[in-house]
């Protein structure tokens, strides 16, 4: 029994376990072996945006007579058409393989979900998983294509509302697709599929053993190690009790937190865990792509009703883990929604990790970005946050930056600069359209080395609200003293 997993540019073959079913890695080099498989799993990623499937690979998949299971982007590639034109004045239509009579259009969903499997080779019943997509609105355009999964979601296009059901999967003949990540990790789904294939218990164990081997191989092929092979040789855990961590908080949205999270992840020698404050886990997928790490419920820290696990559960998980570094990415600006007690700074205070303030120079100029960062620096320190330093992103004038750096050093403030990307196209914008390979390669090329301090993890969190208005009042009193 051979079950292939497609490992090509833009794919996420370790984003989930896929039921521990894959036994063979399929790449651009051995794609002709697809015909010998019993089944092929096409994982999520940025397969559409990365233009990853060449004509020969497409032909091999179309002519394959075994079972095909596409997850998220792997499902989209099986469809007829995909409109990736989010925030575009006109649709941007990409052609799929046409194996499923389905069309996609923009719909953002990053929920953990309960889904229902309709009667199929996977059985029928309810399971759990998560959505992580930008264009997930599904229209089934032919009666021969049947609905495979329906998901219950509460948040669509960033808006929380009453729970509703959306079509999340479809199938036709031997071709199956779903937007639900962890679909195959539901035991009943996996076991019904294996039963349909006539797999015995002994064969099942053989599959699992093969899967362990290819997971190790897939990990070694992570982009991080391909870009810097030395890190693979040196990637040894020295002390399970010592962990280093930071939180990236910004002065506003679109400051480049995701880009910097990915850049930092590419440099560190050791196991890196990335997490997002709030529910938009799409922001950390580039780092997970680079690292070839799995998305778990602990990668999203709950803020209000958005996100997956609360702070104490996150810290408990981290404390018991064998990760060397923890990088937490904030949501929007550090103080956004602080009056409602659902801001990034309030989560940062509970986490107790040191903070770097990110301020982008493309809106109010390099001088304005520095002044904004200093205001955030001052207020966060007043509140009791450990502020480690400031990162000015999208720097366009290094002469001006160096003057500001000298000034910051005079006042014992660490200031770092990251240059502006030459061409920030749609494929480099996480919330719109992203090519993971290009995004991560750009991030790897960033010259950024910051100190990531050792952290003491205290998972006994006091459940108390921080009075932001009072904090602000005290801070403003100090301002008026001048």
From Swiss-Prot:
One GO term describing the cellular component: glutaminase complex
Domain Glutamine amidotransferase type-1: residue ranges: 1-203
Pfam families registered for this protein in UniProt: CbiA, GATase_3
One MF term in the entry's GO annotations: transferase activity
Gene Ontology biological process terms, A to Z: cobalamin biosynthetic process; pyridoxal phosphate biosynthetic process; pyridoxine metabolic process
Keywords per UniProt: Glutamine amidotransferase, Transferase
Taxonomy, superkingdom: Archaea
Name by which UniProt lists this protein: Putative glutamine amidotransferase-like protein MJ0138
Lineage: Archaea, Methanobacteriati, Methanobacteriota, Methanomada group, Methanococci
């Amino acid at each position: 029994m051979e079950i292939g997993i497609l490992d090509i540019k833009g794919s996420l073959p370790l984003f989930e376990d896929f039921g521990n079913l894959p036994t063979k890695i399929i790449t651009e080099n051995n794609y002709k072996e697809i015909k010998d498989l019993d089944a092929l799993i096409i994982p999520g990623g940025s397969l559409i945006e990365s233009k990853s499937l060449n004509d020969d690979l497409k032909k091999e998949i179309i002519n394959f007579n075994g079972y095909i299971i596409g997850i998220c982007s792997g499902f989209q590639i099986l469809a007829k058409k995909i409109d990736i034109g989010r925030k575009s004045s006109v649709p941007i239509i990409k052609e799929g393989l046409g194996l499923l009579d389905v069309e996609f259009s923009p719909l953002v969903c990053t929920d953990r979900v309960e889904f229902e499997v309709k009667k199929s080779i996977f059985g029928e019943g309810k399971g759990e998983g998560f959505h992580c997509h930008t264009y997930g609105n599904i229209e089934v355009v032919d009666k021969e294509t049947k609905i495979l999964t329906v998901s219950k979601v509460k948040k669509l296009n960033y808006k929380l509302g009453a729970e509703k059901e959306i079509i999340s999967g479809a199938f036709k003949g031997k071709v199956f697709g779903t937007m639900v990540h962890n679909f195959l990790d539901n035991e009943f789904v996996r076991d019904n599929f294996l039963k349909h294939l006539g797999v015995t218990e002994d064969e099942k164990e053989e599959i699992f053993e093969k899967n362990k081997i290819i997971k190790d191989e897939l990990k070694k092929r992570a982009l991080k190690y391909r870009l810097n092979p030395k890190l693979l040789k040196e990637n040894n855990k020295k002390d399970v009790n010592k962990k280093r961590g930071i939180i990236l908080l910004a002065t506003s949205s679109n400051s480049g937190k995701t880009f910097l999270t990915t850049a930092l992840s590419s440099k560190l020698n050791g196991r890196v865990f990335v997490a997002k404050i709030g529910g938009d886990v799409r922001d950390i997928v580039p780092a997970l792509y680079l690292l070839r790490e799995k998305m778990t419920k602990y990668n999203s820290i709950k803020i209000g009703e958005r996100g997956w696990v609360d702070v104490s559960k996150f810290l408990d998980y981290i404390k018991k883990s064998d990760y060397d570094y923890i990088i937490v990415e904030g949501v929007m600006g550090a103080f956004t929604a602080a009056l409602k007690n659902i801001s990034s700074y309030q989560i940062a205070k509970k986490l107790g990790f040191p903070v770097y303030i990110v301020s982008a120079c493309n809106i109010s100029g390099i001088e304005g970005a520095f002044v904004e960062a200093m205001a955030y620096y001052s207020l966060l320190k007043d509140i009791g946050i450990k502020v480690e330093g400031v990162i000015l992103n999208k720097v366009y004038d290094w002469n001006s930056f160096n003057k500001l750096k000298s000034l910051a050093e005079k006042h014992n403030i660490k200031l770092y600069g990251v240059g502006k990307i030459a061409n920030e196209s749609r494929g480099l914008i996480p919330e719109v359209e992203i090519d993971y390979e290009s995004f991560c390669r750009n991030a790897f090329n960033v010259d950024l080395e910051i100190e990531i301090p050792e952290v003491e993890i205290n998972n006994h969190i006091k459940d108390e609200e921080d009075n932001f208005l009072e904090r602000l009042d005290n801070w403003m009193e100090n301002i008026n003293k001048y």
